[in-house]
Amino acid sequence: MKKLSHSIDVLSINENECTSLLKACNLESRLSLDLNDIENVKKAVKTLSSEFGLKIDLHTRIGAAWSDGKDVLFVNSFYTVPKKLTGSGDCWDAADLVAYFVGLDTTERLLFSNAYASLYIGRREFEPPTIAEAVDFIQAHYQ
């Protein structure tokens, strides 16, 4: 991964991928692999980002984090009763890319991606929400 870091703008991973990378790099002994704790999520993403020398976005059940190896930022997930078990990570990644392309700052980007995935997983149908629906959801649920 270090050899590719000059070619990668950002690495987007989920909690299972994060745990696998930490284990593959023998970094799990330095921190807890319990990614149901905000501080552990922040430490994990910062550790991997520092190790690989690239920015990392990490999305988990409890929220999303970003790090460049020095700084780290975390945004909580929205509470949603899941109506399906697959696809939320793909929706999160798609929203994250859109947010990068339109120039949202890190907090806005993670918030938008969390909202988009939450809307998707909270619906019975397998169609992703619209951008407008995600914006409306944030305005109604974010404090």
Please provide the spans of the model-predicted regions:
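Short, well-ordered strand-loop elements centered on a beta-strand within folded domains, enriched
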Residues: 69-76, 143
